[in-house]
């Protein structure tokens, strides 16, 4: 008698991918965080797209758009909370993924590690823009702190802040 998980065509695909996966026996749960990063990224993109459908750049109506999403949009409250908490979960998985790389000495593969560092900077820049740009004045503090950090870069700091924000003070909605 054959086992159904090895003979049925559809169940065999799931069996080969999850149960009888040809992977080394020394892989621990630390190796799951790369996959979790992908899941978190997909959730962030999808919820961000749906939230952007109700985006308002006017500072007078920005907070009203948030309440509109939570009250009037079907499962809008869930979209908002998934997007906010998904960002936190994304960065938790990201830092655990980096920690796993440090623990197992992956920094010795310099090309791969440098690509990871570039991706980390790109993720942080994207998260900053996603945090600062929408909904007007909700993130003055974050924009001010990061603007001051950019200003501290030698030689190019002043020009960089002028180019990004137009000056040291952040005012009104930045997406108009």
UniProtKB/Swiss-Prot annotation:
Origin: domain of life: Eukaryota
Annotated CDD domains: Cytochrome_b_N
Annotated heme b b566 binding sites: 97
InterPro entries: Cyt_b/b6_N, Cytb/b6-like_sf, Cytochrome_b_N_euk/bac, Di-haem_cyt_TM
Primary site of residence: mitochondrion
Cofactor annotation: heme b
Record membrane topology: Multi-pass membrane protein
Transmembrane segments: 33-53, 77-98, 113-133
A Pfam family it matches: Cytochrome_B
Keyword set, alphabetical order: Electron transport, Heme, Iron, Membrane, Metal-binding, Mitochondrion, Mitochondrion inner membrane, Respiratory chain, Transmembrane, Transmembrane helix, Transport, Ubiquinone
Residues that bind heme b b562: 83
Gene Ontology molecular function: metal ion binding; ubiquinol-cytochrome-c reductase activity
Keyword Lyase attached: no
Signal peptide: none
One Gene Ontology cellular component: mitochondrial inner membrane
Subcellular location: Mitochondrion inner membrane
Any one Gene Ontology BP term: mitochondrial electron transport, ubiquinol to cytochrome c
Record's cofactor remark: Binds 2 heme b groups non-covalently.
Subunit structure: The cytochrome bc1 complex contains 11 subunits: 3 respiratory subunits (MT-CYB, CYC1 and UQCRFS1), 2 core proteins (UQCRC1 and UQCRC2) and 6 low-molecular weight proteins (UQCRH/QCR6, UQCRB/QCR7, UQCRQ/QCR8, UQCR10/QCR9, UQCR11/QCR10 and a cleavage product of UQCRFS1). This cytochrome bc1 complex then forms a dimer.
Family, per entry: Belongs to the cytochrome b family.
More details: Heme 1 (or BL or b562) is low-potential and absorbs at about 562 nm, and heme 2 (or BH or b566) is high-potential and absorbs at about 566 nm.
Function noted in UniProt: Component of the ubiquinol-cytochrome c reductase complex (complex III or cytochrome b-c1 complex) that is part of the mitochondrial respiratory chain. The b-c1 complex mediates electron transfer from ubiquinol to cytochrome c. Contributes to the generation of a proton gradient across the mitochondrial membrane that is then used for ATP synthesis.
Protein name: Cytochrome b
Species assigned in the record: Nyctinomops laticaudatus
């Amino acid at each position: 008698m054959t086992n159904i998980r090895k003979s049925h065509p559809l169940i065999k695909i799931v069996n080969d991918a999850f149960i009888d996966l040809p992977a080394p026996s020394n892989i621990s749960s630390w190796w799951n965080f790369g996959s979790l990063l992908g899941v978190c990224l997909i959730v962030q993109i999808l919820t961000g797209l749906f939230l952007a459908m109700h985006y308002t750049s006017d500072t007078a109506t920005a907070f009203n758009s948030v309440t509109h999403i939570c009250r009037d949009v079907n499962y809008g409250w869930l979209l908002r909370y998934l997007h906010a908490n998904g960002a936190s979960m994304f960065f938790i998985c990201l830092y655990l993924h980096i920690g796993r790389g440090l623990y197992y000495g992956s920094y010795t593969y310099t090309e791969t590690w440098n690509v990871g560092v570039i991706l980390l900077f790109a993720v942080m820049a994207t998260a900053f823009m996603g945090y600062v740009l929408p909904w007007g004045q909700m993130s003055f503090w974050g924009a001010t702190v990061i603007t001051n950090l950019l200003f501290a870069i030698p030689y190019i700091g002043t020009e960089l802040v002028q180019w990004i924000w137009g000056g040291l003070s952040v005012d009104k909605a930045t997406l108009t």
